[in-house]
Amino acid sequence: MATINQLVRKPRAKQVVKSNVPALEACPQKRGVCTRVYTTTPKKPNSALRKVCRVRLTNGFEVTSYIGGEGHNLQEHSVVLIRGGRVKDLPGVRYHTVRGALDCAGVNDRKQGRSKYGVKRPKS
């Protein structure tokens, strides 16, 4: 335990909290332009072709973003909205594209969990 005199001379160091999503710069979402749209394979033990895109953000960062849902309409030069949220089995992918915003369309024929995939309520 430090004495009061020691604490007066050199106070306790504050713990620095490191962000999981530095490119967002404390914003909820950021806009960016797709520079490359491609598929990649996950870590073991999973197997798939995960849809991802490389995005140049408005603040100059270039990040890799996951495209959730079945099927998408993104290509190079598409303008997308990025939110935080990593993909556990894709190393280096720390962002998600927001479906149903800007150039990224919602998922077709989605009935449940629609809000996560940018789908309006169906006419019943």
Curated annotation (Swiss-Prot):
Subunit structure: Part of the 30S ribosomal subunit. Contacts proteins S8 and S17. May interact with IF1 in the 30S initiation complex.
Disulfide linkage: none
Keyword RNA-binding among record annotations: yes
Family, similarity comment: Belongs to the universal ribosomal protein uS12 family.
Gene: rpsL
A single GO BP: translation
Residue(s) carrying 3-methylthioaspartic acid: D89
Protein name: Small ribosomal subunit protein uS12
NCBIfam families: rpsL_bact
Source taxonomy: Bacteria, Pseudomonadati, Pseudomonadota, Gammaproteobacteria, Vibrionales
